[in-house]
């Protein structure tokens, strides 16, 4: 992109949202141009935000990682799929909805903050199941989630 094209692109937007893994960083390594790009955008008055489909990590953890990589970020600058799915369930089904969480404790914490009521088994009659990435999930939890969906609970999936 030529310099005039880049300036025109920056000047025509109030905000820019960036996916994280593969765009801002690769695993634990920052993409070399990312810190300077974010700085330049911010210096030109463009709001910078980050989106991730990683439901396993809290936005505080992600913001700390970005800051450590030379990209200052606050938790409010980061939106995760866990936040999106818990907000969706709370909006569609309302506070007080019983949800079976088949994901990391991050999703459980966000569900509670949104007024949802996490339960642990299909026998507690959850009205919804929220499934998300959890590298340590046990088959018994997936089984309970499947039983709940089979019994009529709405199934919400996140990465």
What are the language-model segments listed below?
Residues 1-20, 24-159:
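HAD-like aspartate-dependent phosphatase fold
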């Amino acid at each position: 992109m030529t310099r005039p094209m880049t300036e025109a692109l920056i000047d025509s937007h109030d905000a820019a949202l960036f996916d994280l893994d593969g765009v801002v960083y690769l695993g634990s390594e920052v993409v070399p141009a990312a810190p300077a790009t974010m700085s330049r955008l911010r210096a030109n008055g463009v709001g910078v935000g980050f989106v991730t489909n990683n439901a396993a990590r809290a936005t505080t953890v992600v913001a700390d990682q970005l800051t450590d990589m030379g990209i200052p970020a606050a938790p409010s600058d980061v939106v995760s799929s866990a936040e999106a799915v818990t907000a969706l369930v709370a909006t569609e089904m309302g506070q007080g909805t019983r949800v079976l969480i088949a994901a990391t404790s991050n999703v459980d914490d966000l569900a509670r903050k949104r007024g949802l009521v996490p339960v642990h088994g299909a026998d507690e009659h959850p009205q919804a199941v929220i499934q998300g990435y959890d590298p340590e999930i046990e088959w018994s939890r997936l089984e309970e989630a499947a039983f709940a969906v089979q019994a009529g609970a709405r199934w919400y999936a996140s990465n």
